């Protein structure tokens, strides 16, 4: 080999080394982890529930003491790696959980967003391990939508590998992740409430859109697919055989079109509509299934960060979870002072007589922001 070629090869090798080092440095500086002292989190005062059974699509939790079954719901936290907003989002959630001492936490999707999020996903689950609180929920439209993100299936796998996560992938023969049921029992083993969780994906493709009759919407948001709706019907009916005339809650991320229909004729029971409802753009039959089966009292969703209302539609309460994250658009984009921001959580107390006491709580009201 000539001296000239050796020099060229040495230069190329040096460039490769420099590029590799630069890539490592850049990667290390990118915001792919939660900058929060998770190991310093103080656990909740006592463990209030335990898992008594679990199979492919159903997990049962039993309360170990008397009193209402308390659930806290958070949604659209958008933990995208931004250190400042991520820290505040996690800190507020942790403070709320320690303050409220819930039996169960549910998340409504868009929890871990953006790319390079494997570590953030594990850290998110570790928060609940430190707190000693069981948690579950669904994914939103932004989990897995970044080309540098782990897949939705991988994320659910990371979550569910932790002891306090009751999130299940669900049946392998239907579409999506997080299609499952949580049954809640009181101290004596009586059923308190059943929670159905369904994946609503992100956006439909142009090809799929061309094959459907769409509502007049700007963004073609997806929803539960036909085989998921059929699973809901069959599972809900099957549970009547074991649980009798039970009542349930449905948790999804993208709202049903039934929300749009309801606000045309019904007054809000609480909250307000501050932006368009970005609901599923086609009729997937889920609300019809809810009507036909007759066990679901309330549907909770996330997705729209400026909506926090509840409204009745054909005897079913359609509600938003109070938006929780500081890492995405909110009232700040409209120039509102922080005292008017909506970030917070939804609290449910499932009372022994079957009544659900619900509160939409803003962090600004609790922590004085």
PLM features: what roles do these ranges have?
Residues 1-18:
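N-terminal Sec-pathway targeting helices
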Residues 25-51, 59, 181-189, 286-293, ...:
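Binuclear metal-dependent phosphoesterase catalytic core
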Residues 30-123:
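N-terminal active-site segment of His-dependent metallophosphoesterases
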Residues 34-59, 123-243, 343-351:
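Extended active-site neighborhood of metal-dependent phosphoesterases/phosphodiesterases
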Residues 42-48, 72-90, 112-119, 146, ...:
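Acidic/histidine-rich helix-loop elements
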Residues 80-83, 113-116, 137-149, 203-206, ...:
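Active-site environment of divalent metal-dependent phosphoester hydrolases
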Residues 84-87, 109-127, 144-164, 262, ...:
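Metal-dependent catalytic neighborhoods of phosphoester/phosphodiester hydrolases
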Residues 101-103, 194-197, 211-305:
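His/acidic metal-ligating clusters that form di-metal
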């Amino acid at each position: 080999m000539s001296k000239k070629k050796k020099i060229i090869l040495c230069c190329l090798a040096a460039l490769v080394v420099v590029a590799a080092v630069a890539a490592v440095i850049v990667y290390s500086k990118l915001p792919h982890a939660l900058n929060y002292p998770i190991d310093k989190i103080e656990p909740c005062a006592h463990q209030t529930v335990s898992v008594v059974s679990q199979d492919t699509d159903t997990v049962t939790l039993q309360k170990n003491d008397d009193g209402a079954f308390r659930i806290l719901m958070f949604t659209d936290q958008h933990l995208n790696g931004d250190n400042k907003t991520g820290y505040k989002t996690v800190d507020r959630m942790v403070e709320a959980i320690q303050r409220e001492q819930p039996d169960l936490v549910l998340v409504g999707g868009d929890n871990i967003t953006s790319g390079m999020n494997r570590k953030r996903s594990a850290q998110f689950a570790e928060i609940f391990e430190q707190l000693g609180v069981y948690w579950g929920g669904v994914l939103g439209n932004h989990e897995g939508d970044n080309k540098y993100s782990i897949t939705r299936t991988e994320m659910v796998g990371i979550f569910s590998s932790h002891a306090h996560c009751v999130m299940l992938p669900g049946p392998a023969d239907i579409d999506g992740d997080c299609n499952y049921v949580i049954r809640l029992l009181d101290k004596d083993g009586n059923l308190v409430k059943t929670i159905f969780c369904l994946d609503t994906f992100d956006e439909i493709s142009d090809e799929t859109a061309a094959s459907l009759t769409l509502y007049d919407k700007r963004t073609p948001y997806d929803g539960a697919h036909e085989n998921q709706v059929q699973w809901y019907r069959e599972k809900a009916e099957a549970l009547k055989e074991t649980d009798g005339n039970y009542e349930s809650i449905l948790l999804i991320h993208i709202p049903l079109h039934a929300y749009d229909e309801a606000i045309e004729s019904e007054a809000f029971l609480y909250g307000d509509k501050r932006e368009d409802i970005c609901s599923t753009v086609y009729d997937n039959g889920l609300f019809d299934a809810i009507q036909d089966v007759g066990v679901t009292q309330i549907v909770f969703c996330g997705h729209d960060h400026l909506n926090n209302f509840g409204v009745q539609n054909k005897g079913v309460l359609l509600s938003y979870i109070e938006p929780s994250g500081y890492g995405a658009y909110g009232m700040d984009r409209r120039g509102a002072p922080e005292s008017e921001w909506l970030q917070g959580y939804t609290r449910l107390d499932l009372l022994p007589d079957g009544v659900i006491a619900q509160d939409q709580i803003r962090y600004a009201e609790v922590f004085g922001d």
